[in-house]
C-alpha cells in the first residue's frame, strides 16, 4: 500500500549508492516518491536507478561528490529541471575514519570535515533557495548518536562533525520555519553499512566490525526518515534517535 503523503514527493538523497541512502531511496520510491540520487560511484547509482525503475518507480541518478559544491548544485538542478520542485533533501553522505587523535591523521580530519560538514552545507546551500521560493520543503540531515556523546578514544573528530550537524540543523530550523521549511535530524547508532570500513587502520576496522555485530539494518533508518516525511505539513519531527536495543553507547 502506498503512503499518500510520500507519493509524488520529489526527494533528493546524497550518498545514495549504498547503506542508508540506498535503503531510503528504495523505500521512498516504493511508496511513490520521485527520488533523485547522488553519489560518487556512478556505476552503483545507475544500478540502483535501474532497479527502482524496473519496479515501476521514479528515479534519476547523478555522479555527486559532496565535497565539490558544483556537483551538489548540479544534482539539485537536475531534480528541479526534471520535476520542477524539490520537496525533500536527505543529506546522508558521511564518512567515519576512526583513529586516536595522537595518530595525527590530519588528512582524514580534513576529509571528515569536508564530507560530514561542508558536504551537508553544500546540500543546504543548493536546495534552500528552491525551497524558499516554493514556500515549502523539508531538509533531513543525518547525524549520529556520536553527536550526543563524544566517541573516544578514536572518534573525537567524527563526533565533532556530528555535533556540528545537530547544531547546524537546529539553527537552520529556527531561521527557515517562517518559509514553511521543516528540518529533521536523524541520529543513528550502529547500522550495518560500509561506514565501518572508513578507517585506514586494519586493527580499528577489525574492532569496529566486532562492535557492529549488533548493528541494525539500514532500512530501520529508512523507515524513520519516511516517518518524518509523511507527517502533515504543520508537523515537524525535529529529531529521531534510533539505535540497536543492545547498544549501550
Q: Where is each model-derived feature located?
A:
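Residue(s) in the substrate-gating loop at a strand-loop-helix junction
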Residues: 144
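Active-site helix of classical SDR
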Residues: 124, 161
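Conserved glycine-rich cofactor-binding loop
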Residues: 17-18
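Conserved glycine-rich Rossmann-like NAD(P)H-binding loop of the short-chain dehydrogenase/reductase
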Residues: 33-47
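C-terminal helical subdomain
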Residues: 181, 185-186, 206-249
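Substrate-binding pocket helix/loop in short-chain dehydrogenase/reductase
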Residues: 100-101, 108-113
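The beta1-alpha1 cofactor-binding region of Rossmann-like NAD(H)/NADP(H)-dependent oxidoreductases
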Residues: 42-43, 63-75, 106
Amino acid at each position: 500500500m502506498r503512503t499518500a503523503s510520500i507519493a509524488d514527493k520529489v526527494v533528493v538523497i546524497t550518498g545514495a549508492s549504498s547503506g542508508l541512502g540506498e535503503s531510503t531511496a528504495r523505500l521512498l520510491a516504493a511508496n511513490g516518491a520521485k527520488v533523485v540520487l547522488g553519489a560518487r560511484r556512478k556505476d552503483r547509482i545507475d544500478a540502483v536507478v535501474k532497479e527502482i525503475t524496473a519496479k515501476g518507480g521514479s528515479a534519476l541518478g547523478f555522479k555527486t561528490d559532496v565535497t565539490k559544491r558544483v556537483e551538489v548544485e548540479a544534482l539539485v538542478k537536475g531534480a528541479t529541471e526534471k520535476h520542477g520542485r524539490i520537496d525533500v533533501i536527505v543529506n546522508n553522505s558521511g564518512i567515519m575514519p576512526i583513529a586516536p587523535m595522537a595518530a595525527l591523521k590530519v588528512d582524514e580530519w580534513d576529509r571528515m570535515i569536508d564530507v560530514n560538514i561542508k558536504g551537508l552545507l553544500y546540500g543546504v546551500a543548493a536546495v534552500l533557495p528552491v525551497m524558499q521560493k516554493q514556500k515549502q520543503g523539508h531538509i533531513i540531515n543525518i547525524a549520529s548518536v556520536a553527536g550526543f556523546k563524544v566517541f573516544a578514544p578514536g572518534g573525537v573528530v567524527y563526533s565533532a562533525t556530528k555535533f556540528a550537524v545537530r547544531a547546524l540543523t537546529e539553527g537552520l530550523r529556527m531561521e527557515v520555519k517562517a518559509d514553511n521549511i521543516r528540518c529533521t535530524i536523524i541520529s543513528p547508532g550502529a547500522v550495518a553499512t560500509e561506514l565501518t570500513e572508513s578507517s585506514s587502520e586494519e586493527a580499528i576496522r577489525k574492532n569496529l566490525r566486532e562492535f557492529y555485530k549488533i548493528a541494525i539494518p539500514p532500512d530501520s533508518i529508512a523507515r524513520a526518515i519516511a516517518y518524518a516525511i509523511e507527517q502533515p505539513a504543520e508537523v515537524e519531527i525535529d529529531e529521531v534517535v534510533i539505535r540497536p536495543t543492545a547498544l549501550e553507547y
